[in-house]
From Swiss-Prot:
Protein's job: Together with its co-chaperonin GroES, plays an essential role in assisting protein folding. The GroEL-GroES system forms a nano-cage that allows encapsulation of the non-native substrate proteins and provides a physical environment optimized to promote and accelerate protein folding.
Family statement drawn from the similarity comment of this UniProt entry: Belongs to the chaperonin (HSP60) family.
Record's catalysed reaction(s): ATP + H2O + a folded polypeptide = ADP + phosphate + an unfolded polypeptide
Record protein name field: Chaperonin GroEL 1
Keyword NADP appears in the UniProt entry: no
Location(s) in or outside the cell: Cytoplasm
Source organism of this protein record: Mycobacterium avium (strain 104)
Annotated S-S bridges: none
Lineage: Bacteria, Bacillati, Actinomycetota, Actinomycetes, Mycobacteriales
GO cellular component, one term: cytoplasm
Statement: the UniProt record of this protein carries the keyword Cytoplasm: yes
Length: 538
């Protein structure tokens, strides 16, 4: 396929136009008075959302060069979402401001490489300053506050706060759709761990990209499973019972994995394969924990149990299992309650006895997994569209609350970013030339999120930025109440992890755009005869 190539300023301008188109669509959702975006769907009714990353994912532009810019910014939003689960709009707006300010200087003759280096140094300095100024979060009310800001809904915020407090930092909070109109919280005995499915073909719920198994049997295997003859007898027995199967082993590969995938596609047997977490002795111990929780046995050649010889009596069970690409949650395992209680007691005793901090930490992790349980927030709403939007905002709120507990919080509403400019004064003094200009571009861009939060609330963005810059740390604009004051006291807060991810990811994309000299895209098919390619940025 032949290509079209653009160079220098023309390439950068086209990419900038794409960055702007995407960012302009996303930025209207920023802040407590942010607006909604309606997305037309190929199937079913339109979706209504105020979640930046959901809007970004939907956007593809017609002009191939502009589309490059849009996709670059989209990667900022998705990456921030993956790391912190929130803050996607802030990241997008920052990236837009950095690209705009940076390209202006490049057009005026600044060296893009030096400029980019200045931007990176500034991003690191701001990230450090944010971490240093963060307040730790503990207690139900503080967590609820973070979740309320994220979901813009006090009731949901309090639910998330309660869920997080009950299961603790290491516990699992999962979000499901409720069959009723109410949103409620349930606690179940469950265990979660950070390993997901080995093949995307196992997915059963395509919207959520999860494999959900109801009332499954669970096979725990100490070693790798690769040969089909070993696994086949067990698969046949499970297929007869008609129950779905979860396999957790050191690894599942080759013929064995291929057979599970084929069976899943043909729907002859609903199965999901997951790698066991951890390594060596820790993996062994964790599999034993799972055996106790699910009421099964770990199949281990060392103890004389061979996969091809055992029957279904070694399988554990659970009420339901949810597996995503990164984690697995086993809810209501079929193991005896007193056996689980004894295991917890034994772990507590080991924690007290051990001298090594590392061992203690790992034992505590296992204890939290066993004792923590799983909080399930069941989200209800009147219509399908409202349900989807509500579920999204609960998921964001849970992610924000987790991030807040991990690294702490800073003042929200874009003011922590704006006030982090102070951290750049010293850095700028130590740099010269175009690197110093890069720091200036960054300092300028730090006002962008606040500018748009204020504009979306109907205020003058520039005035708000000027005012907040003069206020003491932690004070800023409360766009909900349209007043200036102590944001932390008012509960206008952001998890610092979210804010930092936005800063670092937007800087890395801006740097890529600034240092672009050539853009190469596929030639659109219908323009094959026409050598000009109607560009409107020259």
């Amino acid at each position: 396929m032949s290509k079209i190539i653009e160079y220098d300023e023309t390439a950068r301008r086209a990419i900038e136009a794409g960055v702007n188109t995407l960012a302009d669509a996303v930025r209207v959702t920023l802040g407590p008075r942010g607006r909604h975006v309606v997305l037309a769907k190929a199937f079913g009714g339109p979706a209504v959302t105020n979640d930046g990353v959901t809007v970004a994912r939907e956007i593809d532009l017609e002009d191939p060069f502009e589309n490059l810019g849009a996709q670059l910014v989209k990667s900022v939003a998705t990456k921030t979402n993956d790391v912190a689960g929130d803050g996607t709009t802030t990241a997008t707006v920052l990236a837009q401001a950095l690209v705009k300010g940076g390209l202006r200087l490049v057009a005026a003759g600044a060296n893009p490489i030096e400029l980019g280096a200045g931007i990176s140094k500034a991003a690191d300095a701001v990230s450090e300053a944010l971490l240093a100024s963060a307040t730790t979060v503990s207690g139900k009310d503080a967590i609820a506050q973070v979740a309320t800001v994220s979901s813009r809904d006090q009731v949901l915020g309090e639910l998330v706060g309660e869920a997080m407090t009950k299961v603790g930092v290491d516990g699992v909070v999962s979000v499901e759709e409720s069959s009723t109109l109410n949103t409620e919280l349930e606690f179940t005995e469950g265990v979660g761990f950070d390993k997901g499915f080995l093949s995307a073909y196992f997915v059963t719920d395509f919207d959520a990209q999860q494999a959900v198994l109801d009332d499954p049997v669970i096979l725990l295997h100490q070693e790798k499973i690769s040969s089909l003859p070993d696994l086949l007898p067990m698969l046949e027995k499970v297929a007869e019972s008609g129950k779905p199967l979860l396999i957790i082993a050191e690894d599942i590969e080759g013929e064995a994995l291929a057979t599970l995938v084929v069976n899943s596609i043909r729907k002859t047997l609903k199965a999901v394969a997951v790698k066991a977490p951890f390594f060596g002795d820790r993996r062994k111990a964790f599999l034993e924990d799972l055996a106790i929780v699910t009421g099964g046995q770990v199949i281990n050649p060392d103890t004389g149990l061979l996969l091809r010889e055992v029957g279904t009596e070694v399988l554990g069970s659970a009420r339901r299992v949810v597996v995503s690409k990164d984690d697995t949650i086993i809810v209501d395992g079929g193991g005896a309650k007193d056996a689980v209680a004894n295991r917890i007691k034994q772990l507590r005793a080991e924690i007290e006895k051990t001298d090594s901090d590392w061992d203690r930490e790992k034992l505590q992790e296992r204890l939290a997994k066993l004792a923590g349980g799983v909080a399930v927030i069941k989200v209800g709403a009147a219509t399908e569209t409202a349900l989807k939007e509500r579920k999204e905002s609960v998921e964001d709120a849970v992610a924000a609350a987790k991030a807040a507990v991990e690294e702490g919080i800073v003042a929200g509403g874009g003011s922590a970013l704006l006030q982090a400019r102070k951290a750049l004064d010293e850095l700028r003094g130590s740099l010269s030339g175009d690197q110093a200009l890069g720091v200036d571009v960054f300092a300028e861009a730090l006002g962008a999120p606040l500018y748009w939060i204020a504009s979306n609330a109907g205020l003058d963005g520039a005035v708000a930025v000027h005012k907040v810059a003069e206020l003491p740390a932690g004070h800023g604009l409360n766009a909900e109440k349209l007043s200036y004051g102590d944001l932390i006291a008012d509960g206008v807060i952001d998890p610092v992890k979210v804010t930092r991810s936005a800063v670092l990811n937007s800087a890395s994309v801006a740097r890529m755009v600034l240092t672009t000299e050539t853009a190469v895209v596929d030639k659109p098919a219908e323009e094959a005869d026409d050598h000009g390619h109607g560009h409107h940025h020259h």
